[in-house]
Amino acid sequence: MTGKVTTLDNGLRIVTDVMPHVETVTVGVWTDVGSRHETPAQNGLSHMLEHMAFKGTKKRNARDIAEVVENVGGYLNAYTSREHTTYYARLLKDDLPLGLNVLADILQHSVFEPAELERERGVIIQEIGQSNDTPDDIVFDYFQEAAYPDQPVGRPILGTVDLVNSFSRDDLAGYMSDHYKAEQMVVVASGNFDQDSFVQQVEQEFAGLSRARDIKTDPAVYHGGLEKQQRDLEQVNLLIGFEGITFDDPDFYAAQIMSMVLGGGMSSRLFQEVREKRGLVYSIYSFMQSYVDGGSFAIHAGTGEEQVAELIPVVADEMHKLSASVSSEEVNRARAQMKAGLLMSLESTTSRMEQLGRQMMIFGRPIPHAEIIEKIDQVDAVAVMRYMDRMLSDNKLSVAAVGPLGALEDYDKIAARF
């Protein structure tokens, strides 16, 4: 997968990825702004803006925006992360001009009508409530807070009810004006379409975008710690993690392979030892989360109140074992899993759009899949053990727990096990 990059005079970048054998196309607009770019008083504003972009423009009301894409069988959506916000449409190939027009409209001509703002404020408050009532959801917010306390990257993407209630139309309009600039945005299309016609339409639709304003972002500084909440539940939802690495760290792929060996599937060490052998959990897995200037590694599990006392020592033991010994069979299996996942994703126009958009946001260029596969194949057992040892030696443990916590050890005792 290699997308062609075109840069317009105003700095807007366009990535075209033509797939002539398919009948669909996915077009996305990536903006280089997420919850980590917010001040404390703005926490949740990126997410609210993403919602409000669909609630009316100068020429379409909220219903029009929903119907115009669905009338042709298309799908329109968006999502906010800590570093980016993405708006996209998935359509039949002949409907690409319509989808692009709608995206350009909502990203440049939203009116933030007061009645719609009040209505959507209620929707987001319900979303926050749903997240708070879902232990295996809210525990991830607690983990971020433990890892990055009192920082934008450690705050919840949704914000708080009080802050959501405080946002005004002027707040939304000002935030969009500050951050939705040509040099901070990338338009990506993957699927069956005419490349020249698409680039020409993007140039026409986004001609009014101005160049970027210098927006400063606080660096992500990992600390570690414990965030917990006692709840009357059947299970303890638990996240245990360490400081991770950036996307461009030389150990990035070794870290991914390490995570796969430790907790990346039914054949992983944690699944086999914790679930299959001991029956302590239904689900357990590990994952890496990287940012442009940091990252984290974590293990998520759900277990009973009494079982948590056995679970944590077993997890610690498995991590120490992995730092001392990894078989070539395990590494080969993890590499195969990563490569298969990558190659399978290339059959989806939406997955390709997301990969290209993310690569442009992070690296400023599309990364050919052959280059990624080459880096995966370079990882050996020594690199995996070395990275695990590197991570454990820092020993900045982050712990988040929600549920019946009577048997949970205090932070220092947990940290000492690792």
Question: Language model features by range: what are they?
Answer:
Residues T7, V18, A62-T217, K228, ...:
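Charge-rich, well-structured scaffold segments of protease-associated domains
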Residues R13-T16, Q229, L238-I240:
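Short hydrophobic-aromatic micro-motifs
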Residues T26-V29, L238-G241, A400:
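Active-site-flanking beta-strand signature of metal-NTP-handling nucleotidyl enzymes
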Residues Q201, L233-G241, D249:
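Acidic, glycine-rich loop-and-beta core segments that form the ion-binding/anion-interacting portion
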Residues P219, Q235-L238, Q256:
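C-terminal non-catalytic interaction appendages of large macromolecular assemblies
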Residues G224-G225:
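Flexible, small-/acidic-enriched active-site or ligand-binding loops
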